Amino acid sequence: MSCPPTPNPPFRPPSHTRVLRTPPLPPWVCLNSKSLSTGVGGQKNQLREASMENGERKKLSSTLSDGDHKEENKLKQGIPQDLSSSPKLDRYKIARQLTEKAIKERKIFSIYGHYPVIRATLRRKGWVEKKFNFFPKALQNLGSEDKSAETKENQEIALERFDDIHDVMSRLVKNEIPYLLWTIKRDVVDYHSLTCDQMLNHYGKTASFTTKIGLCLNMRSLPWYVQANPNTFFPRCYGLCTESEKQEFLDDFRRTVAASILKWVVLHQNYCSKVKGKSKKEEAKNSDPSPKKDPENPDLKLPSLSGQVVDTACKVCQAYLGQLEHEDIDVSEASTEALSEEEWNDLTQQYYLLVHGNASITDSKSYFAQCQALLSKISSVNPQTEIDGIRNIWIIKPAAKSRGRDIVCMDRVENILSLVAADSQTTKDNKWVVQKYIETPMLIYDTKFDIRQWFLVTDWNPLTIWFYKESYLRFSTQRFSLDKLDSAIHLCNNSIQRRLKNDKERSPLLPCHNMWTSTRFQEYLQKRGRGGTWGSIIYPSMKRAVTNAMRVAQDHVEARKNSFELYGADFILGRDFKPWLIEINSSPTMHPSTPVTAQLCAQVQEDTIKVVVDRKLDRNCDIGNFELLWRQPAVELPPFNGSDLCVEGISVKKAKKQMPPIASVGLSESLLDAPPKVRSARALMETVIRPPRTTVRQDWKREEAKVLSTTWSMPVMDAEVRGRAKPIYAFEVNDYQHVDNKSHKSGYTRVQSSKVPGVTLTSAQHPALFAQTMKPTQMTSSPPPTASGNHRDSSPFCPIVFEELWLHPNSQRRPSSCILQSRAQGWIRGIP
């Protein structure tokens, strides 16, 4: 909307009046660049009237200093060069032009979360932000770090300049559809309502590899998808909320106990051979067979274990080796000599004394060769033998939490099972997972570290993975030691370490912010003669681990075209520089907490935009430090056409069951022995004949109902007698048979006795029911028994034949009482 030139002359304040800098113009005010004039003292002042969209008018003035280029540079941010080079610009006119161009090119984006780098990168590329209407419900599910970042983001938005050109452009696109959504969680948006043109930085159903329990279960299925062994790059893991998983973990713990005893013997002898001639604890165990004394308490004798412990451990390891080499396939379970529960408990307790109680094994030197040979065979078939160590430490993690929350390390099986049992009654299944702790990690200056490696998935069919060339290391604040199982020593998560102070005994060569870039790490390896290790072992192994994890999870993810997601994988290096995959994180933190993350996190976000946005228009564009890791051939899905589906053949006709003739039901004798007392003949009929209440209801809108023909012997009384008398009647039931359907008649229900043609029972209550003329049936009526009361002895006692029953098509009411249900899909209804 254009505004006419202001007729008022430029305002010049008196010399003694200080020029005030008034607030900038709101976005709905139109400016006229012709009204700018040069004021006193080299300052530009203006006073104009501008029409607003709602009809209001305001008088605003703005003053710009000739030497103040900060505001001008801020204005030019995100503006093409051809527009920003002009000295006389209407910022709101530029905002409208840029907005119209962005709408035409579908460059509208929305951000939920603290992602200033993504916002600035998209703005430089001509994208316009539509302010995201976030949901408080989604904010409740965020962690404390996410909430603080979101609060900071909201404060930054609130403190923005009101006349910021990007804020103006955001108001202009408030009714437009964003074509790029960048959120901290997928549930923030309605995932299934997105159009195919909208990009989202998340996929659905990624819990199969972004949660600890999902990755644990998926890695077991890896051999079905890839010719690879998950035990070569993923430490074995178990869920602790199912009995089968608990038993598998218990068996693994016990096997590790046996292998640790053998390792103790080998390590003890190797250590003794290096310290010959020195008075050491391990040397004295073999030189002096007598029980050793504690150096801190000489009067306390340390326990000494017999060689039977080593024999039992060798027996267990030999059986385990046979399982790994598949020698137990043709052997029955009854023939195997497994340890009893009591023997397992005894072996475990002796192991605790050996490792934690500083006990020794008598004559352990004689078992050295046997233990070394057996361990060598196990190592050749079990790639995790080296990382197991001798302490048998396991790390217990919540199944679906992140940032190191509630993670503990334990080395006693009873403590692990007790932790799960105490929490199993109030939690869902698979809340806890237990994973073998890497007891022999690579250390830098006696300090443990892990590696955060990014990778990007842009499609699941075909699976397309981009691997980032840069990564960073996270150090612990404490020196590494297995004597203490504190999280500060064994967990390198920045969310945990940032709350702790660096240990004074830690090497001063480590950075105070506890992070290195991968480039700095390569320099460290180069100085120690291991410069080629990164390119030959570490980097390729991390690539293979990520590729295998994504290929096995491909069938579980809810794939969506035009979506992408950036993940963060955590690795720990062993002593042999082999990386071990620990977990994969969705929505990895991009908070610039250290100088390292401030550099790399901003860099990886900018490069992500290059891959997912720029590469759509130019396949040869710059993609930063990303490299294509894996792209499989696309799997063509067969088209679905329901019209081609048909079934040919002849249907099987179900044979009709023939109704056998039913003989006379002898109810007369039983009724005569104990005749019921009823008020009327109708009540008598309903009491004796009607089916149970659970009978399936018949569809009363059918055009006709097939019924049975039967004969009932009953007295016919006058109306005055039926209302008040309480006689006892005999009721005779005779043979009945199927009758063919007759022609349809309309009228009232009419039932007439063949022997008493003058007596007619008419139901005016149900006019839709009617019957044909009854056929007489030859039979002998049973006389009623003598009874006291007002019963008339002269009452006629004659049979009434119910021949056929018809149902009117327009009938909306059903008869009152059901007398008999036939097997020929028909009903006989009583007379009310």
Curated annotation (Swiss-Prot):
Changing W224A: Decreased monoglycylation activity. GO terms for cellular component: axoneme; cilium; microtubule; microtubule cytoskeleton; sperm flagellum. Changing R619E: Decreased monoglycylation activity. A protein binds at R403. Highly expressed in testis. Expressed in brain, heart, kidney, liver, lung, muscle, spleen and trachea. Expressed in sperm flagellum. In the brain, specifically expressed in ependymal cilia. One of its GO terms (biological process) is cilium assembly. Changing D328N: Decreased monoglycylation activity. It is an enzyme of class 6 (ligase). Pfam families: TTL (PF03133). This is Protein monoglycylase TTLL8.
